[in-house]
Amino acid sequence: MIDSQLPLTDIHRHLDGNIRAQTILDLGREFNLTLPATTLAALRPHVQVIEAEPDLVSFLNKLDWGVKVLGSLDACRRVALENVEDAARAGIHYAELRFSPGYMAMTHGLPVAGVVEAVIDGIRAGCAAHNIDVRLIGIMSRTFGEDACLRELDGLLAHRDGITALDLAGDELGFPGRRFLSHFNRARDAGLRITVHAGEAAGAESIWQAIRELGAERIGHGVKAVEDPALMDFLAQEGIGIESCLTSNIQTSTVATLADHPLKTFLNHGILATINTDDPAVQGIEIEHEYHVAAPAAGLSVQQMRVAQENGLKIAFLSEEEKAAVRARLAA
């Protein structure tokens, strides 16, 4: 359950994995694109997971239609604004929305830096209209290789003031983190915070690599950490947070059942683990579902859910003053 006395956060939430089906239809018509369906009901199986996908890459393919319709920078601005609206409607007080500007730019050849600027504009407009604090995490999509990731990093750093952190996402097995060392060195030099998708498709060594070589302060998913007791101890001792996404890990077949999910083990071990959505529109869920349905099915007690909710703000990429402001806004 969600504790109404605590700020509700979602710090692992993909902006480009949360494009409304209606928006996909609208933009498809606007740019005269051929979509796989012309009604919401018929489109949904193409853009939303109906049954668990066999692997992570199959799951990621569901995101493609959402970005294929981004035919202009205004379209990018629209989906960013709608993401803030969706988070506010879900009762979230603080969100970190992450996006891959190269992925969003790819289909229609948009300028990557322009996509970054449009997303920042949309987020700022959304925050001005709703009682929510949102920060942006730029993603480098490892699946497209080192050069494409460099272009993404260039675009993100061109608008550094609007970007809080850097992430690496995509095909973890095919494109291991060691290929992106120079990218992360540059990002850290620019003052960006670091989170990395690791231990989702690959094993515990991928998490070690993200921490030791890329400078990860948090780990996205990280389910394979349970395979390495020394890593579990290290995560707890060093305060390296885990951004858990329960339903997502079932839908990608990363974990067989919610009862098998390691989130409870993480919390019992003193790791700063959190509850997040991942790709709400693609998954057909919202943060409330993760607390009210997924977390109990994963064996979490009410107290453990409360701890996970507290951890969300604890490991957020905010200063202590900014965290206090989030708490004060809830109390007001």
Swiss-Prot record:
The record's free-text note on cofactor binding: Binds 1 zinc ion per subunit.
Cofactor: Zn(2+)
UniProt EC number: 3.5.4.4
Keywords: Hydrolase, Metal-binding, Nucleotide metabolism, Zinc
Binding positions for substrate per the UniProt entry: 14, 16, 170, 279
Site residues (Important for catalytic activity), renumbered to this chain: 221
InterPro entries hit by this protein: A_deaminase, A_deaminase_dom, Ado/ade_deaminase, Metal_Hydrolase
Active-site residue numbers: 200
Catalytic reactions on record: adenosine + H2O + H(+) = inosine + NH4(+); 2'-deoxyadenosine + H2O + H(+) = 2'-deoxyinosine + NH4(+)
Signal peptide annotation: none
GO MF: 2'-deoxyadenosine deaminase activity; adenosine deaminase activity; zinc ion binding
Catalytic EC class: hydrolase
CDD domains on file: ADA (cd01320)
Pfam families membership: A_deaminase (PF00962)
A single Gene Ontology CC term: cytosol
Biological process, per Gene Ontology: adenosine catabolic process; hypoxanthine salvage; inosine biosynthetic process; nucleotide metabolic process; purine ribonucleoside monophosphate biosynthetic process
Sequence positions that bind Zn(2+): 12, 14, 197, 278
Family statement: Belongs to the metallo-dependent hydrolases superfamily. Adenosine and AMP deaminases family. Adenosine deaminase subfamily.
Role: Catalyzes the hydrolytic deamination of adenosine and 2-deoxyadenosine.
NCBIfam families on file: aden_deam (TIGR01430), PRK09358.1-1 (NF006846)
Protein name per Swiss-Prot or TrEMBL: Adenosine deaminase
